[in-house]
Amino acid sequence: MGRLSKKIRPTESNLSKIPNQSGVYLLYRGKKPPYVGKAGPGRLQKRIRQQLNTRRGITTIRYKPTRSEREAGVWEKKYRNKYNPTQKRI
């Protein structure tokens, strides 16, 4: 699959364009390291929406669709180690 998306704002218009498949996502709150998460098959858009409902202050989102939940887990680990190696949460 491709690269991470460009940073997008969490607007309804942008969220509706996120595909319904497995993937990894990064949620940014200002300049803090991003929250890194993954979504199983058919759940990328839904999972991002769920996170936005529970996490306040998210300003931008990036995501990467994957072919499987396993692949999403591999990318989640890679991005977590890159952006926030000591913890997962922002």
Question: Which residues does each predicted region cover?
Answer:
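Active-site-proximal loop/helix of nucleotide/amide-processing enzymes and allied scaffolds
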Residues: N81
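Coupling/hinge elements of helicase-like and P-loop NTPase modules
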Residues: N84-I90
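GIY-YIG nuclease catalytic motif and its immediate N-terminal context
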Residues: M1-N53, T59, T66-K78
